[in-house]
Amino acid sequence: MPDIATRRRFLLFLVKPSHYDDEGYVIQWWKSALPSNSLACLFGIAQKCMEDQVLGEDVAIEIFPVDETNTRVRPHDIARQIQDNGGFGMVGFVGVQSNQFPRAIDCARILRAAGVPVVIGGVHVSGCLSMLPERPDSLNQALDLGISLYAGEAEGRFDEVLCDAAAGTLKPIYNYLHDLPGLEGATGPYMPPERVGRTLGMISSFDAGRGCPFLCSFCTIINVQGRKSRYRSADDIEALVRINVANGVRYFFITDDNLARNRNWESIFDRLIELRQQGIHSRFIIQVDTACHKIPRFIEKAVAAGVKRVFIGLENIDPDNLAAAKKKQNHISDYRELLLEWRKHRCITYCGYIIGFPNDTQESLVQRIQIIQRELPLDILEFSILTPLPGSEDHAKAVAKGVDIDSDLNKFDLEHVTTDHPRMSREEWQEAYRLAWRTYYTPEHIKTVIRRAVAGGPRPDTVAYLLTWFWASFHFYNIYPLETGMIRRRYRRDRRPGMPLENPLVFYARHWGGQVVTYGRILTMFAKIHLWMRRLERDPNAKNYTDEALRTSDDFDHQEMYQLTEAARQAGAKAKRIEEHKHARAPVAEPVVEAVK
């Protein structure tokens, strides 16, 4: 083997791009909220290629992972480093979503002008090639710049890309959509601890499985990762956890779209429970469906394994809207029991709610959110705009019908209206989104959720922190909370091409002055909530608090959720019949007669 000092260096930059805010500045933070699992997957795969010396014994691959949500990307500097290395290197933009594609192209344009090989992969490329009969302008623009496109997953295939890049023979398109790899025993995701440290709470990620069996029309996962699920084994997960814990990382986001439908969930949870018994304690955030509480032992074992927070795709409380989106697996009669079960185990629930289904109006939206506030014991409600994302059935149908869709991909972030609605103008729809956040995150309801937590739910201080964070994300940043972080970074020269470069005096005064005012108001709000919560915790009657949402059973005849529409009434009536049938079949206990002595 050649001496390490004499080996050639191949510089591999793996970049997870961010996207632009409404003023054209890259959304970036000192510490970001969530990690990028795509970046972790590619880093792990690239490390394996490095260890296997896929470019030959005389070549050392140096890998530089960059998450732009917490690290500034300087394309000119990257180009200079690769040029100084004799042009021997490559930049891969990984996990690029549709809203991140314009930013990736803007960076790639600079790199390509310097002759740097560039590959872009992710859900936008994969979704477009999977669902559209013709390549859209966005992909053709990339190809015209000499950028290579990668569709599909990289396990077992990335060495081909590296070899082609090293040889200067990158193909225009690498398409592995119809050859998805198995995950058991595959190289797992990994991020160096110094990169993980750039996230709030030192949180890393991994996927225990990919693919989803459901048919939601707004979803891209089923058309990119497939409807046939693939899984990692308990051994794989144990190895991932052990290597991270050895490096000081104990908090993980398991990114499976629906962990409850991972057939290995029980063996994985059992293994994590064993690790905890050995003193290896980790915490997890997971995503599940609305029927996971019906799976025997699922919630109990999830909690025993270390699950603390749960994302649930509630999406809507109108059965007609759910049916229109092919979300037929969601039954509104399951919602209360599901949420109460997670609450009983002191887990924080995050629930997604989509705005823009066919029956939605501003008035109906406010009505439904107020019903949720009163009748469902959830903690965090996350709003998103129904968006025809490239790669989804909704987008493919819209394109086929010639529907007017916004051409600016930067808006495809689930926060901006990108097409027309049957009952609202685009402006009204956008205002409905803002109205949703204002309606749910009122000081009064924030206190109600904390009261429920103090009365026997998840940790009240964590709930108070999260509620304040979500409230602040909308009120001060107008950014989806999970895209926010701690201390906003804005760089004057990192503005979207075509937008003017601001005067330095104006820019820095506005940026830093705004930071001071914003954080002052956030801290004031948090202090008020925190002090109020401490007083509440000292109240001996606080543990006895109850309200309609904390009822242990549904009142199908009187709850407003079951009176909204005819479909809702039918759902309530059906659930009531099932409950009555269960009670009728329940064995009647015989009276116990004590023996007479």
What is each model feature region?
Residues 21-22, 125-131, 157-158, 214, ...:
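Flexible glycine/acidic-rich beta-alpha junction loops that bind and position SAM and/or redox cofactors
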Residues 14, 93, 120, 254-256, ...:
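Conserved beta-strand positions
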Residues 53-56, 111-116, 274-281, 345-346, ...:
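Short helix-capping segments at alpha-helix termini
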